[in-house]
Design a protein with these regions (language model features):
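ATP-binding/phosphotransfer module of carbohydrate and carboxylate kinases, centering on a glycine-rich
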Residues: 1-4, 26, 47-54, 98-196
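Short beta-strand-loop/turn "lid" adjacent to the catalytic site in phosphate-handling enzymes
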Residues: 1-35, 48
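Small-residue-enriched, tightly packed secondary-structure blocks
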Residues: 7, 40-45, 58-64
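Short strand-loop junctions, especially beta-strand C-caps/beta-turns
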Residues: 10-12, 79, 195
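Short, acidic loop-to-helix structural element flanking the phosphoryl-transfer center
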Residues: 16-19, 60, 177-180
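Active-site phosphate/pyrophosphate- and oxyanion-stabilizing loops and adjacent acidic/basic residues
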Residues: 23, 42, 115
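Conserved phosphate-binding catalytic cores of ATP/NTP-utilizing and phosphoryl-transfer enzymes
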Residues: 31-55, 72
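Glycine-rich phosphate-binding loop of actin/hexokinase-like ATP-binding domains
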Residues: 51-108
Length: 196
């Protein structure tokens, strides 16, 4: 007999509301005995096995969750692309496209990102990317995939893209340090897990 269910879903930062639980868990019987948590909490529990530590999630979005010695969580980031998940693959792709546009308009550095995007999307120049990225099917996960495709094509040989990636790493590191400090997690060695 199952006494309690725990279900995780994206976009939930704390314990879910009754409405969220009913909407997302209504088919699980009995849903009143179901705990609905954010996907980062589930990821944290899987990575740390419930012990104090840090989970850095950096994929389509970016978030950091820290569990301290008192089993209290600090969660930073994870606000989604409209509110700028700094350091995420989505963020990297947008920065790369912006760098290509700046290159095209002669307002930024020369970069192989421009020709790479033209080759990947079989477009004459970077202006051709506009209808593609504004198409409803070009979702944020496709931006994230684009970051990986650019990285693979450039093979670490483009200074502008390397700078974007270094900036992404710096932003994620700053977010992680801030989360650890806010959580008052002062243990050594500090268990840090990465996902994404």
């Amino acid at each position: 007999e199952i006494i309690h269910y725990t279900v995780s879903a994206a976009g939930i930062f704390n314990e879910a509301t009754v409405d969220q639980k009913e909407k997302l868990c209504g088919k699980i019987y009995p849903w009143k005995q179901t705990r609905l948590v954010g996907d980062s909490v589930a990821g944290y529990q899987a990575a740390t096995l419930g012990k104090p530590g840090v989970l850095v999630i950096c994929g389509t979005g970016t978030s950091v969750i820290v569990g301290n010695l008192e089993s209290k969580f600090t969660h930073l980031g994870g606000w989604g692309p409209l509110l700028e998940d700094k350091g995420s693959a989505y963020w990297i792709a947008v920065k790369a496209i912006r760098a290509a546009i700046d290159n095209f308009e002669n307002t930024g550095e020369e970069t192989a990102i421009t020709s790479t995007l033209c080759e990947l999307y079989e477009i004459k120049n970077i202006q051709g990317i506009v209808p593609l990225i504004y198409h409803p099917e070009f979702t944020r996960d496709k931006f994230a995939i684009l970051a990986a495709r650019i990285d693979k094509a450039l093979e670490g040989k483009d200074k502008v893209f390397q700078n974007i990636c270094e900036e992404a790493g710096t932003e994620v590191a700053k977010l992680t340090i801030t989360a650890v400090e806010k959580a008052n997690l002062d243990i050594s060695p500090l268990p840090i897990f990465f996902s994404g």
